[in-house]
Amino acid sequence: MFLKFMIQVIINYIFDSNNNILVLASEKEAKTSEDKIIMIEKDSGNITELVDLIDLLPDYYSTTSLPDGAEDLDWMHINSLSLVDKTSLIISSRETSTIIKLDNIYSNPTIDYMIGSDNFWQESGYDSLLLNKTSDFSMQAGQHCVTYVEDNSLPQGQYYLYLYNNNLAVSTTHPDYD
């Protein structure tokens, strides 16, 4: 199973609540990159694919295209993982300028919500997953390093998300977006 994945260990791994390693990975023979999340078990070294973003966003994936000169389709460009609780993740997609919360990552992954541009996701079939913007602030664009932080001063169920905002929205695999 290990040889099935190309593992990019730069900043794209975290430890789960059992100290297993969750890693952003690319399937070795796939034509896509950085669109899978795998778990490496700490005791056995066994590798399990937890999340395949093509399974979660198939309609969006079908609208993307390989940029000229590219070797693989980096259609989401996931650049950070942050564990929310024992079974949820916050991921950052630079290619879509979207923050995505995934639930049930160990059994039946689903998208809980997304934070991104209404313009980017309108009529995509996924726009109902977007949280509503309730204040006047700049939306993130090409963000990196999204980090989940609990704070006991916040009401139950609320938390902070910190991120580095590149403030540059580029989507090379979705050329119709400008």
Describe the predicted segments one by one.
Residues A141-D178:
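Loop/turn-rich, solvent-exposed surfaces of beta-rich toroidal or solenoidal domains
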Residues S26-K28, D52, R94, N166-L168:
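Short loop/turn segments immediately following the C-termini of beta-strands
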Residues M1-M6, S44-D72, N108-S138:
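Surface-exposed loop and turn segments in beta-propeller and other repeat-based domains
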Residues E29-S33, D74, R94-E95, S138-Q140, ...:
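Short, solvent-exposed loop/turn segments at conserved positions within beta-propeller repeat blades
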Residues M1, S33-N46, S97-I105, H174-D178:
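Beta-propeller blade signature
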Residues M6-Y13, S65-S82, L129-S153:
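Signature of short aromatic-glycine-proline-rich micro-motifs recurring in repeat-based ectodomains
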Residues L22, S88-I91, Y160-Y164:
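Conserved beta-propeller blade signature
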Residues D72-G116:
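Loop-centered beta-sheet repeat module
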